[in-house]
């Protein structure tokens, strides 16, 4: 769903395993925010839920982002880093979004 073939393949395999075990599937949209717009038919917007996170969880996300030094600096001089300011700000919001499919889907 996120547009990266390796990540989509891993997600598909994990989703199949969850469904085989009768578990609900939650998918976190990481890159969909970059290529989709509201109403984009490729995205199951009706399956999206928002879950609040605690201040402690936000702090842990901040610490985790800091560990990705290679993505916090420009790969090429003069270009923005992969994890630019907008991506970091979105990651530190006190809410996480997921697409939820029940076990029968």
Would you name each region that the model predicts?
Residues 1-105:
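Metal-dependent de-N-acetylase/amidase catalytic core
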